[in-house]
């Protein structure tokens, strides 16, 4: 039983997006309401932007299965990874992608390179975390990763809880 629980904890740790997707880069534009740089109107920014040079590696924030690898009008070259438990990460504006739909990826695996494709003002990674299809603040997951895996799992569980 103890061995089974340890295995479950290890799986959860690797499947919750707590790994920094661009190493050594601080987040620029944060999650939340801001003035859209294209329209000049207030709009919800559904992710976290990491400014980096074109070609900088983009890493999977957690293990999972690639459910989308496409060119999107707004996101440009984009990858989405399903981590189970209705938890998905999105990586947008890539110059190149190295995975395809159906690929199994591990935490920290290089999946793409930073670019400025789609609706972008310069080279960066736009990183999103979606729980049950609803955008969440990725910073909460990344901070939880710095605090420890158990906390990351708690953040994912709390984000998935039904709202009243």
Give the label of every model feature segment.
Residues 19-164:
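Catalytic cores of peptidoglycan-degrading enzymes
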